[in-house]
From Swiss-Prot:
Reaction equations catalysed: di-trans,octa-cis-undecaprenyl diphospho-N-acetyl-alpha-D-muramoyl-L-alanyl-D-glutamyl-meso-2,6-diaminopimeloyl-D-alanyl-D-alanine + UDP-N-acetyl-alpha-D-glucosamine = di-trans,octa-cis-undecaprenyl diphospho-[N-acetyl-alpha-D-glucosaminyl-(1->4)]-N-acetyl-alpha-D-muramoyl-L-alanyl-D-glutamyl-meso-2,6-diaminopimeloyl-D-alanyl-D-alanine + UDP + H(+)
The name this protein goes by in its record: UDP-N-acetylglucosamine--N-acetylmuramyl-(pentapeptide) pyrophosphoryl-undecaprenol N-acetylglucosamine transferase
GO MF annotations in UniProt: UDP-N-acetyl-D-glucosamine:N-acetylmuramoyl-L-alanyl-D-glutamyl-meso-2,6-diaminopimelyl-D-alanyl-D-alanine-diphosphoundecaprenol 4-beta-N-acetylglucosaminlytransferase activity; undecaprenyldiphospho-muramoylpentapeptide beta-N-acetylglucosaminyltransferase activity
Enzyme Commission (EC) number: 2.4.1.227
Pathway(s) per entry: Cell wall biogenesis; peptidoglycan biosynthesis
Annotated keywords: Cell cycle, Cell division, Cell membrane, Cell shape, Cell wall biogenesis/degradation, Glycosyltransferase, Membrane, Peptidoglycan synthesis, Transferase
Residue spans crossing the bilayer: none
SUPFAM superfamilies hit by this protein: UDP-Glycosyltransferase/glycogen phosphorylase
The keyword Cell wall biogenesis/degradation appears for this protein: yes
Broadest EC class assigned to this enzyme: transferase
Classification of source organism: Bacteria, Bacillati, Actinomycetota, Actinomycetes, Micrococcales
Organism: Arthrobacter sp. (strain FB24)
InterPro entries listed in its UniProt record: GlcNAc_MurG, Glyco_trans_28_C, GlycoTrans_28_N
Length: 366
């Protein structure tokens, strides 16, 4: 490695869950090494094609090579496709004169891990989920520098570093930002605020239950900001956007830090980023894990729930009756909310981006 210039290739993409920590790690590397040369690698069809350039990073792409989980023709084609992707990855690493590869998971990472191993380029990995993905399980076999967002993640050589997140979130002072955030989001400064989100893709079952709970929430003096997800506005019986006293819906909020500052209680899915961010900033939460997949979201929520910073309810049990029984009394109890906030914040990690940057520097110094 040239002492004057560090070349880092960052691999990952497909979803915001991979891209957000990648961008946070990149920003932290720029802080500790202002002369660093950064190149992100993703696929041509993922969200990274929009988010990475918007963050001021150069993006290279390679072919997407999913691993079939059942016997099929795609499984027979896998060796050839993977070999082609590894060649593409190798050319990218060579052209970048890469000193280190940082992978955050996703289809793009496996070929890059294999290409880096052949070139004896150090590999640094971040795993965002409680259950590690296949690509990072492969990469961890070749790496001594593996960071995980959740302490219980089983991955070879893992160190618990937390979830790298945007500085606007990790540096948030909820109390100091509360007034301005509520003003921005159109919320009353004095009423308790429930903010509901299903994530970037929305959550129709959550939306339905909240719509059926609005009268009870309003009668209890609770205001609700409902972030429905793009293209998923909640409609009334006449096909118009639902309206009610103390209720406002938007499809999307750009900047979750304002949501975290304004809310007394957050209700949503238990994606890795949401769970880690709510813990880091110390916000009480109700998690409704996504009822599909391998139960990963329920595992994500386990830590904050056990610590007393969050409640969890399965999707089928999340009904208007549950809202009346659990959420309304909670939002009417400031002392309990404050205790949950303290428990949540005690569990959170705000400097995961810097921890990962230090891991990268450690890898290249070996």
């Amino acid at each position: 490695m040239n002492a004057e210039s560090l070349s880092v290739v960052l691999a990952g993409g497909g979803t915001a869950g991979h891209i957000s920590p990648l961008l946070a790690i990149a920003a932290a590397l720029r802080d500790v090494r202002p002369d660093v040369r950064l190149l992100a690698v993703g696929t041509p069809s993922g969200m990274e094609t929009r988010l990475v350039p918007a963050a001021g990073l150069e993006l290279a792409t390679i072919s997407r090579v999913p691993f079939p989980r059942r016997p099929s023709l795609d499984l027979l084609r896998l060796p050839g496709r993977l070999a082609g992707a590894v060649k593409q990855a190798g050319r990218i690493l060579d052209d970048a004169h890469a000193d280190v590869l940082v992978g955050v998971g996703g289809y793009v990472c496996t070929p890059l891990y294999l290409a880096a191993r052949r070139r004896k380029i150090p590999i640094v990995i971040h795993e965002a989920n409680t259950r590690a993905g296949l690509a990072n399980k492969v990469g961890a076999r070749f790496s001594h520098h593996v960071g995980v967002a959740f302490a219980g993640t089983k991955l070879r050589g893992a160190r618990h570093v937390g979830m790298p997140m945007r500085r606007e979130v990790s540096g948030l002072d909820r109390a100091a930002s509360r007034h301005a955030a509520r003003e921005l989001l159109g919320l009353d400064q004095h009423k308790p605020a429930l903010i509901v989100t299903g994530g970037s893709s929305g959550a129709q079952s959550i939306n339905r239950t909240i719509a059926a709970s609005l009268d009870a929430l309003a009668k209890a003096g609770i205001q609700t900001l409902h972030i429905t997800g793009k293209g998923k506005s909640v409609l009334d019986g006449e096909g118009k956007p639902l309206a009610a006293d103390g209720y406002r819906q938007v499809e999307y909020v750009d900047g979750m830090e304002n949501v975290y500052a304004a809310a007394d209680l957050l209700l949503g899915r238990a994606g890795a980023a949401t769970v880690c961010e709510t813990a880091a900033v110390g916000i009480p939460a109700v998690f409704v894990p996504l009822p599909i997949g391998n139960g990963e979201q329920a595992l994500n929520a386990a830590g904050p729930v056990q610590a007393g910073g969050a409640l969890v309810v399965d999707d089928e049990s999340f009904t208007p009756e549950w809202v009346s029984r659990e959420i309304i009394p909670l939002l009417s109890d400031p002392a309990r909310l404050a205790k949950m906030a303290a428990s949540s914040e005690a569990l959170g990690i705000r400097n995961a981006d810097r921890r990962m940057a230090d891991l990268v520097l450690e890898a290249v110094s070996k």
